[in-house]
Curated annotation (Swiss-Prot):
Entry annotated with the keyword GTP-binding: no
Alphabetical keyword list: Heme, Iron, Metal-binding, Oxygen transport, Transport
Parts forming coiled coils: none
InterPro entries: Globin (IPR000971), Globin-like_sf (IPR009050), Globin/Proto (IPR012292), Hemoglobin_a-typ (IPR002338), Hemoglobin_oxygen_transport (IPR050056), Hemoglobin_zeta (IPR002340)
Family note: Belongs to the globin family.
Native species: Anas platyrhynchos (Mallard)
GO CC terms in record: blood microparticle; haptoglobin-hemoglobin complex; hemoglobin complex
Domain Globin residue range list: 1-141
Binding residues for heme b: 58, 87
Name assigned to this protein: Hemoglobin subunit alpha-D
Quaternary structure, from the entry: Heterotetramer of two alpha-D chains and two beta chains.
Disulfide topology: none
Length: 141
């Protein structure tokens, strides 16, 4: 459960991400592919080389979905319902991968934002990403 303070910190953090969504999203995907090569199996039709147009495009989609979730912190289930359906029923992505990508996204934030990514912000964003992963996995039950 996100507290009022968590929501405030998440919103502040996302303001820092604005303008870097494609960059951060694609870098998070690249990190995931390197650290967890088994995740590449969900992208057989992608050119997975660093900086490829497909990875940049999907990274932008990931970051946009997270941005949409940030705007709907009080109703993540509704905000992510279509995405949950897509990943559960069409793409059949193993839900563990949501947590892997969340971890990689946090590494990207820490690397780019440095001191602006405070321990409090990190903790709040970790709770947020856990909530997002849980919502995306809801349809698997």
């Amino acid at each position: 459960m996100l507290t009022a303070e968590d929501k405030k910190l998440i919103t502040q953090l996302w303001e820092k991400v604005a303008g870097h969504q494609e960059e951060f999203g694609s870098e998070a995907l690249q990190r995931m592919f390197l650290a967890y090569p088994q995740t590449k199996t969900y992208f057989p039709h992608f050119d997975l080389h660093p900086g490829s147009e497909q990875v940049r495009g999907h990274g932008k989609k990931v970051a946009a979905a997270l941005g949409n979730a940030v705007k709907s912190l009080d109703n993540l289930s509704q905000a992510l319902s279509e995405l949950s359906n897509l990943h559960a029923y069409n793409l059949r992505v193993d839900p563990v991968n949501f947590k892997l990508l969340a971890q990689c996204f946090q590494v990207v934030l820490a690397a780019h934002l440095g001191k602006d990514y405070s321990p409090e912000m990190h903790a709040a964003f970790d709770k947020f990403m856990s909530a997002v992963a849980a919502v995306l996995a809801e349809k698997y039950r």
